[in-house]
Amino acid sequence: MLEAKNLTCIRDDRCLFQQLSFCIAPGEIVQIEGPNGAGKTSLLRILAGLAEADEGQVNWRDNNIRRDRAKYHQDLLFLGHQPGIKSVLTPFENLLFYQSVFQKVDSAAIWQALAQVGLVGYEDLPVSQLSAGQQRRVALARLWLSPAPLWILDEPLTAIDKQGVSTLLALFVQHAAKGGMVLLTTHQDLGAVSHNVRKICLANTQEKSCLSACCAVN
């Protein structure tokens, strides 16, 4: 279980959210919602252990992630706004490197991942020669290779076509059905899977100078 406990985040003297607490249990898909500037990306980075909250803590399996960040990151797949891939390598080489860090290399699984994101035929081109959308798909292909139970994804559906979105949403549901956890932000309609998604809204209450959180379940 992932637990956010009394998180407060202040950026540039502005309070984005305050005393924010929630849990994500195995089998859940959770969407963080809110207007631009509400702190969605900041929250994801805090939960991923890539940034510090001004107050509060993040627990993974009842342990503060600060105690063993490396072990926590073994259980986590984080995809941010930047694809986080090496431009001098090909899509296949990028996925080969990623897979070798966490598990035994399986070339067939890499080919399958490339096929899922529509990159068959581009596997031998340097990533620097691919479009921004194609580079994004290289990063997303890691989802088919990752053994991590916890996925934290910042706008994973951006620059993805309708068929690609459907494929990703089906993968999220499959991952959750196996006991995994998916935490994401997106501006896109989750359509048919929205009934499986719990939403946490970072909403401006207007009565306070700080953005607080409210939770709603579809």
Swiss-Prot record:
GO cellular component assignments: plasma membrane
Catalytic activity, EC: 7.6.2.5
Coiled-coil ranges from the UniProt annotation: none
Keywords per UniProt: ATP-binding, Cell inner membrane, Cell membrane, Cytochrome c-type biogenesis, Membrane, Nucleotide-binding, Translocase, Transport
Molecular function as annotated in GO: ABC-type heme transporter activity; ATP binding; ATP hydrolysis activity
EC class name: translocase
Keyword Kinase belongs to the record: no
Main location: membrane
Annotated InterPro entries: AAA+_ATPase (IPR003593), ABC_transporter-like_ATP-bd (IPR003439), ABC_transporter-like_CS (IPR017871), ABC_transptr_haem_export_CcmA (IPR005895), P-loop_NTPase (IPR027417)
Family according to the record: Belongs to the ABC transporter superfamily. CcmA exporter (TC 3.A.1.107) family.
UniProt name for this protein: Cytochrome c biogenesis ATP-binding export protein CcmA
Species per Swiss-Prot/TrEMBL record: Yersinia pseudotuberculosis serotype I (strain IP32953)
Gene from which the chain derives: ccmA
